[in-house]
Amino acid sequence: MSAAVTISIDAMGGDAAPDMVVEGVRMAHERLPHVRYLMFGDASRIEPLLARFPEIRGVCTIHHTEESVSMEAKPSQVLRQGRKSSMWLAVEAVQKGEAAGIVSAGNTGALMAVSKFVLRMLPGIDRPAIAGMFPTVKGETLMLDLGANVDCNSNNLVEFAVMGEVYARAVLGLEKPSIGLLNVGSEDMKGNDAVKAAAAALRDSHLPISFYGFVEGNDICGGTVDVVVTDGFTGNIALKTAEGTVKLYSTFLKEGFQSSLLAKFGYLFARHAINKVKVRTDPRRYNGAMFLGLNGIAVKSHGGTDAFGFANAVGVAVELVTHGYNDRIRKEFDRLKPAEVSPSQLAAGTR
């Protein structure tokens, strides 16, 4: 039997909150019956929803607050005025040790700002990174950063590589995950100074990383490497492009099979294969972006997801807790200290 885990939930975060959030917790409970939830939000709206799902009433504790963070709120505004919001209180529960991780479908910028302010960074890490899974022809690939840091230096990229490598080993169970740096070409002379310096640091360092080298955009879904490292500007564009491509592909298929009576008849034969493809590319299955590098587990669900997607985000948080991701990151960076060369010193030396 799995050990009990407590997750704090920003019940008011997301386009369809709190309905989507509570139903998502119900779906997560079916797969993760050992998890308990601290739900932060408006009790007058959450209680009726829990009454609809009595099977989770016993594992949910409501912490009432009437304040929430809007999707339009600026992070700086939330840091000044949002300390009684459902998002802030949910993050604070992790900092106080009341919960092992927090999940929110709310404002991404605000969640990152609040998480950094309340949880702080793990020792030895300069910046957090948003990480997520991409479907590939070979399975899945972890990619980071997906939007936390628009500008990155070589030090940041090296740290992201270490965090991604530890995640791939600890959570994905890969014995020796391969790491690739996203670039405009695979040749050594291509790319900006930060990318080239990070590549040199990873190649020449004592770090226990299987560095593949540079990868290009088409390598992400090709499954060329297990972990793709990039800055948040490029990573977020890649993520949104992939999401848009899936929607475009689905639209083309729908239009094609509705174009004629013969096409509709053909769909009957192809339906099973098409549904398998839809399942593999369903963005809800990969919902749950991880804020790696924080001194606490924080997972961001897509704001427009449904209950199924939110349940998957909860699952991501539980996996991080269960596999002791943050403890492993601490040990990894502590282990680097005796060599008297930290990732930041390595990258700085190549700039």
From Swiss-Prot:
GO terms for biological process: fatty acid biosynthetic process; phospholipid biosynthetic process. It catalyses: a fatty acyl-[ACP] + phosphate = an acyl phosphate + holo-[ACP]. InterPro entries: FA_synthesis, Phospholipid_synth_PlsX-like. Keywords: Cytoplasm, Lipid biosynthesis, Lipid metabolism, Phospholipid biosynthesis, Phospholipid metabolism, Transferase. GO terms for cellular component: cytoplasm. One of its GO terms (molecular function) is phosphate:acyl-[acyl carrier protein] acyltransferase activity. Pathway: Lipid metabolism; phospholipid metabolism. Its EC number is 2.3.1.274. It is found in: Cytoplasm. Disulfide bonds: none annotated. SUPFAM superfamilies: Isocitrate/Isopropylmalate dehydrogenase-like. Pfam families: FA_synthesis. Catalyzes the reversible formation of acyl-phosphate (acyl-PO(4)) from acyl-[acyl-carrier-protein] (acyl-ACP). This enzyme utilizes acyl-ACP as fatty acyl donor, but not acyl-CoA. Belongs to the PlsX family. HAMAP family: PlsX. Homodimer. Probably interacts with PlsY. This is Phosphate acyltransferase. It comes from Paramagnetospirillum magneticum (strain ATCC 700264 / AMB-1) (Magnetospirillum magneticum). The lineage of its organism: Bacteria, Pseudomonadati, Pseudomonadota, Alphaproteobacteria, Rhodospirillales.
